[in-house]
């Protein structure tokens, strides 16, 4: 398949309770619990700048809660898990390297799956049998991103450089995770960065 090396990602975890992972002596992965619930997924056909291929609004019920990374996976987290991998993948693939608190980017979906396989192996003694670190489903991600709101963004219907790092904010590169305010559920950078 085609490799797209320009994505970032978050880690999900199928388990209840508080969860924080020590990846090494100085790197931690913080995750927040999201309660199950029902929300409206998709966007209204009247939404400004809506892409034609976007899903129309429809109700989705998540019957199980889940964990999601409080931040995008950082360069330091990615390096802590991927150092020594045997898949010929760089442990430091970033366009803007040596920024440990910026999100990792220039990774493909396959790279993210290898990261998760390695994370699960490294943390196998610390997680219950049958549970695993995974990429969130589209429904889980949108539910956490919307955070109970019905607007285009979790803070309203407008976006600007004080709220998110995005293609016209003028920065032309990533920022440290958590630079902008969190959404109502406590997740950072759900709109923008990578």
List the model feature ranges, each with a label.
Residues 1, 40, 44-46, 98, ...:
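Functional-site microenvironments in short loops/helix caps that host divalent-cation chemistry
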Residues 1-19, 182-183:
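Disulfide-stabilized, aromatic/cysteine-rich ligand-recognition loop
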Residues 1-3, 22, 57-58, 177-179:
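Short Gly/Pro-enriched turn/cap motifs at secondary-structure boundaries
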Residues 8, 23-88, 107-110, 191-192:
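A short glycine-rich, aromatic-capped structural motif
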Residues 12, 70, 75-82, 113-120, ...:
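Non-transmembrane alpha-helical segments in soluble domains
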Residues 15, 85-86, 123, 148:
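A general structural signal marking secondary-structure boundaries and capping sites
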Residues 58-61, 96, 169-170:
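Short, flexible turn/loop "capping" segments at secondary-structure junctions
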Residues 91-94:
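Surface-exposed intrinsically disordered loops and tails
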